[in-house]
Regions:
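Structural core segment of the AMP-binding/adenylate-forming
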Residues: 167, 171-250, 358-359, 366-367
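Conserved AMP-binding/adenylate-forming core of the ANL superfamily
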Residues: 44-48, 95, 109, 113-167, ...
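Adenylate-forming
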Residues: 157, 199-218, 239, 340-344, ...
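Conserved AMP-binding/adenylate-forming
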Residues: 302, 390-517, 524-527, 540
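AMP-binding/adenylate-forming catalytic core of the ANL superfamily
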Residues: 154, 179-204, 219, 356, ...
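Conserved C-terminal "lid"/linker of ANL adenylate-forming enzymes
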Residues: 231, 554-560, 568-572, 588-659
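Conserved AMP-binding/adenylation subdomain of ANL enzymes
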Residues: 293-311, 321-361, 376-377
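Conserved pre-ATP/AMP-binding loop-to-beta segment of ANL
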Residues: 109-111, 234, 245-274, 281, ...
C-alpha cells in the first residue's frame, strides 16, 4: 500500500509475511498444545494471553525452550500486585540462554556481535569467541570473590566489552548495573552508591562527535567514592596504560575457559536500572533473571520477529534500558549490532549509514532522530541500500504522524514501522510491534501479549477512543521485584499503585482505539488541564515541530494562585529563524488547525535550548516546579540534566513573573 487515508492503514503485511511470522507459528502451535484460539488472528491470541495468563507464560517458556535446571511448582505463585511471584521453585540462568547459539556447530563461528564506531569499521565477534570470553571473565570474577547477589558495575560505552562484562556477571549470579561514560561523576555516584558494587569496569575515555573525551579523572573519583569496590577493571579504549591498582581487561579474558552458569532462582536479580532522577535520587529498579528472560524472549522473538537470520541494531547507550533490550537480542540467535558514537556524526545520516553497512534487518532509534532527519530533508531510501531493513522501530517519545509518513515515503513503502512504548520500569514494551497487524499513522499497533493494557478514567472505568491513564491490570514477569534500598516497599508501591490499588499505573496518557491500536499522548504527571479538558504535551509537540523554524519545543501548564491557568510554549528555533509576530501567529494557527483552540498557548517564548534528562527526554515536571517558584536545588536533581544552565532561564522567568 502506497498511501493512507484516515481510515486505511499506512502499511499492511502480506499473507506470506503473516504466515511466516513467529507469532503466527506460535499461535498455531499454542492452539494445538494449550488450547489457544486458532482463528481470530492476533486480537484473539492477545485476549487469550491475558485471560489465561498462567497458560500463556507456560507456553512461552516451552516455545522458547527455557532451560529450568529445577522445575517450577506453578507459573504464578501469587498474582497480586505488587509482589507477584513467578515460577516458584524454578532455577535457571539468563547468560546460559544468551550464549546458547554458540553450542550449534553450524553457527558458532558466525557473528554474535557486530561492533561499529565512528570510523564505521566493523569488528565482528563470533558466538564461540563471545562464549569463550564470557567463560574466562566469569571465572576471574569468581576468583575475585564475586558471589550470587554481588553487584558489578560498568562505566562503559556501547562496546563489546560491556556485553561480555554483563554476561559474565549474570553467569556467576551477580547483579549488573551500568552508566554511560558521558554521565558525570555525581550522576554515576547517585546510582552506584545506592547499590554498593564490588567490581567496576571502566574505560579511560570514549570517542564521540569525532573527538576523544578523557574520563580518567572521573574514574579516579568513582574509585575514591565507592568504598565497597574490591576490583577495578581497566579497558583502554583510548590506548592508555592501566592505572595503578587496576586490572587489565585483556588479562582477565585471555583464558580458554568453558563458562559455568550459576543456577539461580527465577526471581534472582539480573540487573539494576535507574529512573531519570530529575526530582530526586534515581529509583534503583531491580529486575529478575527469569522475568527478563521470558519477557525478552516474548518481545524479541514474537513481537520483533527476530531470529538467527536477522541483524538487530538499536541506537542506544549503556545508560538507557534499550541497551539491555538490545543485548537480549542474543537470546533469539540474532546478530546484535553495537554502535558507539554520535547519532549525528559526521552528519545526520550516521545511523542510516550504520544500518546499511551492517545489513540491519530491524533498526531501532528515537522518534526525535526520525524527526531530525525529516527536518534535515535527507533521503535514506535513495542514498543508502536499506533493502535488508524490514522494520524501523522508534521509542523514547511518541512518533508523530509526520514521522510515520516520512519513514514510509523516504525509506520504503513496504516498511514495517513499529512505534513502541513501555518503560525502564519493566525494561520492555506495553504496546508496539506486531508483525501481523497493519500500521496506522500515529498509532502503536496493539497492546503486547500477556499485557492487559487499558485506558482508565480517574474512577477506574475503562475507556475506548478517549484519553485516560495507562494501566496494566495483570502482572508481567519483568515488573520490578523491588527497588533497591526500599525495605518496606513503600517507594515501589507509591510509584505505580497509589492511584488504583493492585493495578499498575504507569504515568502516561493513552487512547485505546476501537480497532485495538494505542495512541500515546505523553506523561500524565505533566499533563495539561485547561478548562477541565486534559491534553497531552506530545500532541502539541507534534503539531508545532512541523514548522521548519522550530527545532524543539516545551509546553507547560501552570495553575496560578488566582485560580487562572497559564500555558506557555517554549521554542528552540532553527539557525537563522526569528521569533517575530508572524512566526508566533503561524505557531498558534498550526496548533489551532491540527488540534483545537484550547491547545493554543498563552505565550510563545524563545529559549536557547530545551533541557533533557541524560537519556534525552524533555524535562517537563522540574520546569513546571521552577515556574511555580521552587528553588532550583529543590526542583531538580542537578546530576540528572544534560545542561543545568538551561534551567536558570526558567527560574529567572519565574522570579520576573513574581516581581
Amino acid at each position: 500500500m502506497t498511501a493512507a487515508t484516515p481510515d486505511a492503514p499506512l502499511w499492511q503485511p502480506g499473507p506470506d509475511r503473516i504466515e511466516a511470522a513467529a507469532v503466527t507459528r506460535f499461535q498455531n502451535w499454542a492452539a494445538t498444545r494449550y488450547g489457544a484460539p486458532a482463528d481470530g488472528g492476533y486480537a484473539a491470541l492477545h485476549r487469550w494471553s491475558v485471560d489465561e495468563l498462567d497458560t500463556f507464560w507456560q507456553a512461552v517458556a516451552e516455545w522458547f525452550d527455557i532451560r529450568f535446571s529445577t522445575p517450577y511448582e506453578s507459573v504464578l505463585g501469587d498474582r497480586a500486585m505488587p509482589g507477584a511471584t513467578w515460577f516458584p521453585g524454578a532455577t535457571l540462568n539468563y547468560a546460559e540462554h544468551a550464549l546458547r547459539t554458540a553450542e550449534d556447530p553450524a553457527r558458532a563461528d558466525t557473528p554474535a556481535l557486530l561492533y561499529v564506531d565512528e570510523t564505521h569499521t566493523q569488528a565482528p565477534i563470533s558466538w564461540a569467541e563471545l562464549r569463550r570470553q564470557v567463560g574466562a571473565l566469569a571465572a576471574e570474577l569468581r576468583a575475585l570473590g564475586v558471589t550470587p547477589g554481588d553487584r558489578v558495575s560498568g562505566y562503559l560505552p556501547n562496546i563489546p566489552q560491556a556485553v561480555i562484562a554483563f554476561l559474565a556477571t549474570a553467569a556467576v549470579g551477580g547483579v549488573w548495573t551500568s552508566c554511560a561514560p558521558d554521565f558525570g561523576a555525581r550522576s554515576v555516584l547517585d546510582r552506584f552508591q545506592q547499590i554498593e558494587p564490588v567490581v567496576l569496569f571502566t574505560v579511560d575515555g570514549y570517542r564521540y562527535g569525532g573527538k576523544e573525551h578523557d574520563r580518567t579523572g572521573t574514574v579516579a573519583e568513582l574509585r575514591r567514592e565507592l568504598p565497597t569496590l574490591r576490583a577495578v577493571v581497566h579497558i583502554p579504549l583510548l590506548g592508555t596504560d592501566a592505572p595503578e591498582g587496576t586490572l587489565a581487561w585483556a588479562a582477565l579474558t585471555s583464558a580458554d575457559t568453558e563458562p559455568v552458569f550459576e543456577q539461580v532462582p527465577f526471581d534472582h536479580p539480573l540487573w539494576v536500572l535507574y529512573s531519570s532522577g530529575t526530582t530526586g535520587l534515581p529509583k534503583a529498579i531491580v529486575q529478575s533473571q527469569g522475568g527478563i528472560l521470558l519477557e525478552h524472549f516474548k518481545q524479541l522473538g514474537l513481537h520483533c520477529d527476530l531470529g538467527p537470520e536477522d541483524r538487530f541494531f538499536w541506537y542506544t547507550s549503556t545508560g538507557w534500558m534499550m541497551w539491555n533490550f538490545l543485548v537480549s537480542g542474543l537470546l533469539t540467535g540474532t546478530t546484535v549490532v553495537l554502535y558507539d558514537g554520535s547519532p549525528g556524526y559526521p552528519d545526520v545520516s550516521a545511523q542510516w549509514r550504520v544500518a546499511e553497512q551492517t545489513g540491519a534487518t530491524l533498526y531501532g532509534t528515537s522518534a526525535a532522530y526520525v524527526m531530525a532527519c525529516r527536518k534535515a530533508d535527507i533521503h535514506p531510501g535513495r542514498d543508502f541500500d536499506l533493502s535488508r531493513v524490514q522494520c524501523v522501530a522508534t521509542t523514547g517519545s511518541p512518533l508523530p504522524p509526520d514521522g510515520f509518513r516520512w519513514l514510509h515515503d523516504e525509506v520504503a513503502e513496504d516498511l514495517w514501522i513499529a512505534s513502541v512504548s513501555g518503560g525502564t520500569d519493566v525494561c520492555s514494551c506495553f504496546a508496539g510491534a506486531v508483525p501481523t497487524l497493519p500500521v496506522h499513522i500515529g498509532e502503536l499497533q496493539a497492546p503486547c501479549l500477556g499485557t492487559d493494557l487499558q485506558s482508565w478514567d480517574p474512577a477506574g472505568k475503562p475507556l475506548i477512543n478517549e484519553v485516560g491513564e495507562l494501566v496494566v491490570t495483570n502482572p508481567l514477569p519483568s515488573m520490578p521485584i523491588r527497588f533497591w534500598n526500599d525495605p518496606d516497599g513503600s517507594r515501589y508501591h507509591d510509584s505505580y499503585f497509589d492511584m488504583y490499588p493492585g493495578v499498575w499505573r504507569h504515568g502516561d496518557w493513552i487512547t485505546i482505539t476501537d480497532h485495538g491500536s494505542v495512541i500515546i499522548h505523553g506523561r500524565s504527571d505533566s499533563t495539561l488541564n485547561r478548562q477541565g479538558v486534559r491534553m497531552g504535551s506530545a500532541d502539541i509537540y507534534e503539531a508545532v515541530e512541523r514548522l521548519p523554524e522550530i527545532r524543539e519545543s516545551l509546553v507547560i501548564g501552570l495553575e496560578e494562585p488566582d485560580g487562572g491557568y497559564w500555558m506557555p510554549l517554549f521554542v528552540h528555533l532553527t539557525e537563522g529563524a526569528t521569533l517575530d509576530d508572524d512566526l508566533r501567529a503561524a505557531i498558534k494557527q498550526t496548533i489551532r488547525d491540527h488540534l483545537s483552540p484550547r491547545h493554543v498557548p498563552d505565550e510563545v517564548i524563545e529559549v536557547p535550548a530545551i533541557p533533557h534528562t541524560l537519556t534525552g527526554k524533555r524535562i517537563e515536571v522540574p520546569v513546571k516546579r521552577l515556574l511555580q517558584g521552587a528553588e532550583l536545588a529543590k526542583a531538580v536533581n542537578p546530576g540528572s540534566v544534560d545542561n543545568l544552565d538551561l534551567l536558570h532561564f526558567y527560574a529567572d522567568l519565574a522570579a520576573r513573573r513574581r516581581a
